Regions:
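Extended catalytic cores of very large enzyme megasubunits
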Residues: 1-364
């Protein structure tokens, strides 16, 4: 039985070679006394076929070790060490080489970033510490691998430390190398971490770095669809969105322009639900929309049912997140078991614009 090494050459493989490699990795991790190394090696050998690549064997070993984490935490340490070591062998050795490869083969790095890269590449290549990659556990690394590390087509180019240095160079490249390296050290030593959009887009020509956006909705067809379009654009660049819909007229309210009746907020929210699914965050994770409604809105009961997995599914929107804006007056009425009245915002004008004493005066 032969395997294909990374240089393309064939090499005979045996149980002894497999167990030796796993023992060497375990030794580099301090021994891993909780791991049955022979058992792992036997499982690997049962999956070997003629012509399998050594990088594929490493991935398989990592998955098998990760599947046994419930037996002992040391299996997780072994799994992360194997897959990260494998990833480092499959990528270029210097930060500058990787960034230049990305710049010349994709559109994910800006000209300004590339200029700063050329200016500081020697200092950065000398400073970056790839051993810090091994501080990530298996599942953390797999998350980075799936969504955060930059690729050329489907081939991952970055290592975790490259991602952190890319962020640092983008944010501080114009203020000098000292700030770049300081930021990198803080990030790589896990003193703090930037938000996901920053990790996704730092260095790109369209560097949308913000996590959260809050949007209101106008009570008209034009206003509703403008807000949906804005949400789609924000989600495209990995932003999470909070939308307040309390000023949208309730079900069965009069539409004066057509003399018809409104269907309320539920059909509209189903469009938001579809938008969140269709326009995911930079193609890397699902869109995230949170919908806010005040407790006096006449559609509040239907709103509270939107997340239920039973009942009339035409009145459900399962992929959105929901929250109520609750006033002090509402909680006072709850405590006293008093009447609470519901309104459509086109009839109770101004309630969405006030709070505190002003809200209580207008509501009462």
């Amino acid at each position: 039985m032969r395997v294909i090494k990374r240089n393309g050459k064939f090499e005979d493989v045996s149980f002894d070679k497999v167990i030796r490699r796993i023992r060497n990795i375990a030794a580099n991790c301090g021994g891993l006394n909780g791991v049955e190394l022979d058992e792992i090696a036997q499982k690997i050998c049962s999956h070997i076929f003629d012509g399998v690549k050594t990088s594929e064997l490493d991935e398989l070993t990592g998955r098998l070790a990760a599947s046994m984490i419930t037996h002992h935490p040391d299996y997780g340490v072994l799994a992360s060490r194997i897959v990260i070591s494998n990833h480092q062998k499959n990528t270029l050795n210097t930060f500058s080489d990787k960034m230049m490869l990305l710049y010349h083969n994709t559109e994910c790095l800006s000209n300004e970033f590339y200029t700063n890269l050329k200016k500081y590449k020697n200092q950065i290549d000398k400073h970056i510490d790839y051993d810090r990659d091994f501080s990530y556990d298996y599942f953390a690394f797999k998350t980075l691998e799936k969504a955060y590390l930059l690729k050329i087509k489907s081939k991952i180019i970055e290592r975790p430390q490259d991602m952190l240095m890319r962020v640092s160079l983008f944010l501080h490249g114009n203020t000098g190398i000292d700030k770049v390296l300081q930021c990198y050290n803080f990030l790589s030593n896990k003193y703090f971490i930037h938000a996901t959009p920053t990790l996704f887009h730092a260095g790109s020509p369209k560097s949308q770095l913000l996590s959260c956006f809050l949007i209101g909705t106008e009570d008209s067809i034009k206003g509703i669809y403008k807000t949906i379009t804005d949400c789609a654009q924000i989600s495209k660049w990995a932003g999470g969105i909070g939308v307040h819909v309390s000023n949208i007229r309730a079900s069965n309210s009069l539409i004066r322009g057509t003399n018809g009746r409104s269907d309320g907020i539920i059909p509209m929210l189903k469009v938001y639900n579809s938008t969140a699914l269709f326009v995911n965050q930079s193609g890397k994770r699902a869109g995230s929309f949170a919908i806010y409604l005040e407790t006096w809105h006449a559609d509040i009961f239907e709103f509270l049912d939107l997340k239920k997995t039973h009942g009339d599914m035409e009145k459900r929107a399962l992929d959105l997140f929901y929250a109520m804006w609750i006033s002090d007056l509402f909680m006072e009425r709850v405590e006293k078991d008093e009447m609470w009245s519901l309104f459509s915002p086109d009839e109770a004008k101004g309630l969405t614009d006030v709070y505190g004493d002003e809200f209580e005066e207008l509501y009462v």
